[in-house]
Amino acid sequence: MRIDVLTLFPEMFSIFNHSIIGRAIEKEILKINTVNIRDYTIDKHKKVDDYPYGGGAGMVMAAQPIVDSIKTVKKENKGKVIFLGPKGKTFNQNLAKELAKEEELIFLCGHYEGIDERAYEYIDMEISLGDFVLTGGEMACIPIVDSICRLVDGVLKSSESYEDESFYNGLLEYPQYTRPATYEGKSVPEVLLSGHHENIKKWRKAKSLIITNKVRPDLFKKYKLTEEDKKILKDFNKKL
């Protein structure tokens, strides 16, 4: 997958040179480029923003450098142009899975009070990270790109690494334990030490369902319980 990020702060994306994403870039599974929008301004002082027409607080990013940077990147990257903004669709795991199927993507990071409305003509999709305010689009872009990239084939060693994680199947993840088996008087559940893979699988599913219902009832309501799920919960409750 190739991703180009249009930003005023390309240095912020050096985080992708590390850990899982960094290794995927080294293996050429991923290619993440940053493009400095400021390089495309025709203003002699390298300004990319100006006062809003009609007055108001703050500054607005000008259309010209945004549009010119998009046009340049589009010569090599034919992917969707995604703007990180408050009017967009709220990002979630399903959207991450959908975008992970793309071969190329372009992300536009806004700043200041927003972007000139005329730049929207070159934007295919707007995504919001949530109902809160961030300093700039970069802060939203980094977790979104990370979430998408880790679902690309070959980035993780196995699909099992993400298929059991929170949100992937609409549920929160089950509790995790590691050595020692007993710590401060608290022991790991016996089923996890049993070596019985089917029982472990059922325990994890039951805990995932119970935790989701308890802390994220909104997610649980959207989840469609199967007959197997109902049986797993019934059997689990009998053992309590």
Swiss-Prot record:
Q: Which GO terms describe its biological process?
A: tRNA N1-guanine methylation
What InterPro entries does the entry give? Alpha/beta_knot_MTases, tRNA_m1G_MeTrfase_C_sf, tRNA_m1G_MeTrfase_TrmD, tRNA_m1G_MTases_N, tRNA_MeTrfase_TRMD/TRM10
Q: What class of enzyme is it?
A: transferase
The record's subcellular locations are:
Cytoplasm
| First-listed, main subcellular location of the protein, grouped into a coarse class | cytoplasm
Ligase is among the record's keywords: no
What are the EC numbers?
2.1.1.228
GO MF annotation terms:
tRNA (guanine(37)-N1)-methyltransferase activity
This protein's GO CC annotations? cytosol
Coiled coil stretches, renumbered: none
Domain of life of the organism encoding this protein = Bacteria
User: Which keywords does UniProt give here?
Assistant: Cytoplasm, Methyltransferase, S-adenosyl-L-methionine, Transferase, tRNA processing
Entry keyword Methyltransferase? yes
Positions with a binding annotation for S-adenosyl-L-methionine: 110, 129-134
Record field: catalytic activity: guanosine(37) in tRNA + S-adenosyl-L-methionine = N(1)-methylguanosine(37) in tRNA + S-adenosyl-L-homocysteine + H(+)
Q: Quaternary structure per UniProt?
A: Homodimer.
Q: Which HAMAP family match?
A: TrmD
The UniProt family comment states: Belongs to the RNA methyltransferase TrmD family.
List the NCBIfam families hit by this protein, alphabetically: PRK00026.1 (NF000648), trmD (TIGR00088)
Task performed by this protein: Specifically methylates guanosine-37 in various tRNAs.
Protein name (database record): tRNA (guanine-N(1)-)-methyltransferase
Q: What's the source species for this entry?
A: Clostridium botulinum (strain Langeland / NCTC 10281 / Type F)
